[in-house]
Amino acid sequence: MSNVNSRLRRARKTRAKIAELKAIRLSVHRSNCHIYAQIIAETGDKVLASASTLEVEVRKDIKNGGNIAAAALVGKRIAEKAKAAGITTVAFDRSGYKYHGRIKALADAAREHGLSF
């Protein structure tokens, strides 16, 4: 089984567990150049808030979108947008990625700015 298939299998299992809980989830996706975060409704059909390194406000503060500092900034922005939408508690969906590096930085920044999971 390839690394990509293993990651996708882990992501499927995590999403199934979160769906059982009927919880709002913070879903994270990363590429080599950017990182994306979305807060998705319990039913999984609606995005309540989103942030990424492609946003104009984020791009003017960072030089490179594929590093830990950029991930921390996205974590801060998603937490602020979630609070503005009245969301304080989410389930963290790391999409099968290791909880390390950019994923960890995003999660820690979101927690620091008021999001609990």
Curated annotation (Swiss-Prot):
Gene Ontology CC, one term: cytosolic large ribosomal subunit
GO terms for MF: 5S rRNA binding; structural constituent of ribosome
Tagged with keyword Nucleus: no
One of the protein's GO biological processes: translation
Protein's job: This is one of the proteins that bind and probably mediate the attachment of the 5S RNA into the large ribosomal subunit, where it forms part of the central protuberance.
Name by which UniProt lists this protein: Large ribosomal subunit protein uL18
InterPro entries in the cross-refs: Ribosomal_uL18_bac-type, Ribosomal_uL18_bac/euk
Superkingdom in the source lineage: Bacteria
Organism: Methylobacillus flagellatus (strain ATCC 51484 / DSM 6875 / VKM B-1610 / KT)
Keyword annotations: Ribonucleoprotein, Ribosomal protein, RNA-binding, rRNA-binding
SUPFAM superfamilies given in the database record: Translational machinery components (SSF53137)
Subunit structure: Part of the 50S ribosomal subunit; part of the 5S rRNA/L5/L18/L25 subcomplex. Contacts the 5S and 23S rRNAs.
Keyword Membrane recorded: no
Gene: rplR
